[in-house]
Amino acid sequence: MLSVNDFFSGCGGLSQGFKEAGFKIQVAVDKEEAFLKTFSHNFKDSQTKNLDLGDSNILKDIPKSDIIIAGPPCQGFSITGPRNIDDPRNKLYLSVFETLKLTNPKAFVVENVRGLKTMWEGNVFKEIIKKFESAGYIVTESLLNSADYGVPQIRHRVFIVGIKKELNKKD
């Protein structure tokens, strides 16, 4: 069974999908204690870590996993908000990038609002993709609508998926 670490876990929406697909949710990391309390209730066999992922010094304290999933805060990218290019939360994807470099997981999945793709004429999104590729991943992205997957709301999300280049070999 492949292990998963969930960054910016919230109460565990992404983790639930991975759990239902047969993955082992190893660790959830979030800076909001209330979110982790709910996560712990729903994922009794998983660890939680109340950490600020904006502090790269804490990344070494997170155990390695096969897959990293992350839903970084979206407020600075959202088309329903002020879309502030200088919002410090916009840089939190860098903690995912740093963890990829440190722990070398087989794959990652990052989820965010569709506004991420158009922020600053798409340049922010292009930079994020380049960074993930520079860490040794083949990266793809898709815009998905949650209503197409049984969720009773229309909610478009960007999913960025990376697979280690060396795993993409044809034998």
Positions of the model-derived regions?
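Extreme N-terminal starter segment of soluble prokaryotic enzymes
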Residues: 1-4
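Short beta-strand element of Class I
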Residues: 24-26
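Conserved acidic E/D residue at the C-terminus of a beta-strand in Rossmann-like folds
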Residues: 29-32, 111-112
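Conserved SAM-binding strand-loop segment of SAM-dependent methyltransferases
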Residues: 45-53
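Short alpha-helix immediately C-terminal to the canonical SAM-binding loop
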Residues: 33-37
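Class I SAM-dependent methyltransferase "Motif I" SAM/SAH-binding loop
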Residues: 7-11
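Class I S-adenosyl-L-methionine
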Residues: 56-65, 77-171
